[in-house]
């Protein structure tokens, strides 16, 4: 039985699962380490009104979260996940690449090397770190040697710690409360008291369809990406109420509607979700909730929940949550990637 598999001990002794859960279990400590790293960078307070964020994939989701946080304070932001970024006058340019070798991010950054005093990079190493050393760009270093998607808390903590130094203090959080929430998601918690295990069992038997609204758009997208990468599950992702005017007509028979919920959820959205549940049946829907009633803490808890769900789903499917065969192979055969890295190596001398 699937419950026996997730509640057993032997499966977590397999090296790929042991390592993946080990990385995830360090979530709060990794965030705290990132904060310390960001706070250690020498910087003066500045008036920040316009921010450009460069990043893609596991690093790009960090850009998304930071952009949402900054926007909530009235700061104009743009997240670029392309090969080139929009020109313009920016007070701050944030480049995030865990490996330091992300071609899209590096190519975009080449446009702004004459504004090195406005740039801050978050990375573990690679060409981005070398570029910082050569040009005097500020670099927030995070620990190396792990898959980028598992370094989300390190990178988020790193850039939030740096933003504190600029006078933008967003990191007042109750980390002990987040740790307490995480304890309920770990592998030693049985399925009947572990929402991540319970969700994974349902997802493993269905076609997952993730519906989000503005307040939970990012946690929902995180779940989609982690199911893709860790569990090798293809899933649908759409925003409501828009999705309720088209794709609900095509929900497959084995479809499972997954909706992250927020304490900031608008009344109209709440009633819409209630109606959708009545229409499809409660057995066809799965709600994901955090415990915190603080904006940033809720985001982190929902991300954490999504990550654990994806790992438990990978266990049930018997796939390796650490290896990405197609993504890495595509990088190897993509001539654009090699051209960008060649140009950057010329810049580095």
Question: Which positions does each model-derived feature cover?
Answer:
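A generic structural motif
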Residues: 79-82, 233-244, 284-293
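Short, solvent-exposed polar/charged micro-motifs at secondary-structure junctions
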Residues: 51, 88-92, 246-249, 295-301
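Glycine-rich phosphate-binding loops that contact phosphosugars or nucleotide phosphates
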Residues: 40, 44-187, 201, 260-286
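Rossmann-fold NAD(P)-dependent oxidoreductase module
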Residues: 69, 111, 226, 308, ...
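Short, glycine-/Ser/Thr-/acidic-enriched flexible segments
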Residues: 58, 215-216, 242, 262-265, ...
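A short acidic, often aromatic-flanked loop/helix-cap motif at beta-alpha or helix-coil junctions
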Residues: 86, 145-150, 243-245, 291-297
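Active-site phosphate/pyrophosphate-binding segments
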Residues: 18-23, 33-50, 164-255, 333-349
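Phosphate-moiety recognition in structured ligand-binding domains
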Residues: 2-37, 46, 130-140, 151-156, ...
């Amino acid at each position: 039985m699937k419950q026996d598999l997730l509640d057993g001990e032997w499966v977590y002794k397999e090296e790929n699962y042991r390592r993946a859960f080990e990385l995830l279990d360090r979530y709060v400590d990794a965030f705290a380490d990132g904060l310390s790293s960001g706070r250690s960078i020498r910087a003066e307070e500045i008036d920040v009104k316009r921010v450009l964020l460069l990043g893609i994939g596991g690093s790009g989701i960090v850009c998304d979260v930071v952009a949402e946080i900054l926007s909530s304070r009235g700061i104009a932001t743009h997240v670029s996940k392309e090969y080139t970024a929009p020109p313009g006058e920016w007070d701050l340019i944030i480049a995030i690449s865990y490996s330091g070798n992300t071609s899209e991010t590096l190519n975009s950054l080449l446009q702004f090397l004459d504004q090195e005093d406005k740039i801050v990079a978050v990375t573990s190493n690679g060409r981005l770190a070398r570029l910082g050393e050569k040009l005097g760009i500020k670099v927030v270093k995070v620990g190396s040697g792990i898959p980028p998607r598992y370094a989300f808390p390190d990178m988020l903590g790193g850039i939030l710690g740096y933003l504190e130094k600029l006078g933008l203090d967003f990191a007042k959080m109750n980390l002990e409360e987040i740790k307490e929430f995480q304890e309920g998601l770990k592998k030693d918690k049985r399925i009947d008291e572990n929402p991540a295990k319970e969700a994974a069992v349902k997802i493993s038997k269905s076609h997952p369809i993730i519906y989000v609204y503005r307040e939970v758009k990012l946690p929902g997208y995180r779940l989609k990406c982690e199911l893709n990468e860790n569990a090798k599950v293809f899933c649908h992702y759409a925003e409501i109420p828009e999705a309720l005017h088209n794709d609900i007509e095509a929900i497959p028979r084995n479809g499972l509607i997954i909706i992250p919920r927020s304490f900031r959820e608008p009344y109209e959205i709440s009633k819409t979700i209630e109606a959708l549940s009545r229409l499809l049946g409660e057995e066809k829907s799965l709600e994901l909730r955090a415990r915190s009633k603080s904006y940033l803490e809720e985001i982190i808890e929902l991300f954490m929940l999504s990550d654990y769900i994806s790992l438990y789903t990978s266990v049930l499917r018997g796939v390796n949550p650490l290896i990405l065969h197609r993504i890495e192979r595509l990088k190897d055969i993509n001539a654009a990637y090699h051209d960008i890295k060649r140009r950057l190596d010329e810049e580095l001398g």
